[in-house]
Structure formats: structure tokens, C-alpha cells
Amino acid sequence: PTSLAHLVTENLHTLGVDEFHLVGNSLGGWICLEMAASYPENVKSITALAPAGLWLTPFTSRYPGEVALRFMASGVEKLAPSALNYTWAKKIGFETVSPRWRELSYELCLDATNAMAGSTGYFPAWDALLGKRFDKQITASIPTTIIFGDSDHTLPFKTCQERSLAPIHAKWIVLPQTGHVPMWDSPNEVTSEIMSTTGVIK
């Protein structure tokens, strides 16, 4: 996560973007936190959606559920366009990710399946975070909002949502009927919090 934070920041500087609001989900949320810790003069706000890294005891091996989902996606990529028309297939793929899996659109499910199947960097990225957690300080001058869902089975409350590791000034929100991808389950609420955190609305 730290090296990715440096890489993203370097790429933004190359593009001439020196100040930015950050929004990221899961590993992306962790990267946002790392960027703010390392480049406080550049980061204007953070909205971290179910960020990884907020665990007291870091993972030492690949999370079994994530391994299963990755292999499942790889195995059904060619079948997905037809299979996802059926409720049973949608349930297998998305029930653990979203409590509102029935409401997810066909297009979203297909895109997510194809993205997972084609993500050659998935396991290298996962392996790179083993034994690590987010444990840095972020200045209180950077508005920070952390959003988790109450039904996040990927980063569950008991082990992966440690508030003591979050910036002390962070606004911490738990959305109802929401899983590991809050922008899927609660898009209006997530959008509202992003706008509030960035200062677009008060």
C-alpha cells in the first residue's frame, strides 16, 4: 500500500495535479490513508470506503474467501454473460459481498466478474499487504471520513474495523444494509458523504 501510494502520487504530479481529494474502496481506501500520511500538503480530503489495513492483527496468508472468489471468477468468465441471468449464479457470486445482491444490476455483476477474472495483479497486491496494517498519523487539517457497511463480510467488524488505527479526527460512519462495496449498496449516502467531506456541500 505504501509503494502504491507513492506511485499514484508521482503519477498525479506527472499529470500536473498537485492537490486532490481522495476516494478509495478496500485496498484503495488504505492507499488513500497512506497518501495523506506521506503527502499531507497535497491531499485535500479523504473518503475511505471499507478501507483495508485497519486490523490489529495483520493477515499472514491469503484470505480464503478472497481466494475462492478470484478462482471462481476466473473459472466462469466465459459463462458469466449467460449465467448471471439466473438468480442462483448471482447469489453465488455476490451474496457475501452485498446484502442487497438481488438489487445489483446485470451489468454491474458482469463487469465485476470480468474485472476479477482479469485482475492479474490481484494476488501480488494481496501478498504485498500481508503482515502490514495502517499505523501512521494523518494531520487533523485533512478532512477524513471512513465508511463501513454493517454487513461487511470481507473486512468484518470484529477483526478489521479497528477505530484506534484511524485518524483521531476522522468521521466514522456505518451504513445499514451495506456490504464491502458501499457505493453499490448505498450510492446516495456515499455520494452525500463524499460531497460533505470535500466541502462541496456543508
Language-model features and meaning:
Residues 28, 32-36:
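Short helix immediately C-terminal to the catalytic nucleophile in hydrolase catalytic domains
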Residues 81-138:
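Conserved alpha/beta-hydrolase catalytic His-Asp/Glu region
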Residues 13-19, 40-41, 141-142, 169:
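Active-site acidic short loop of glycosyltransferases
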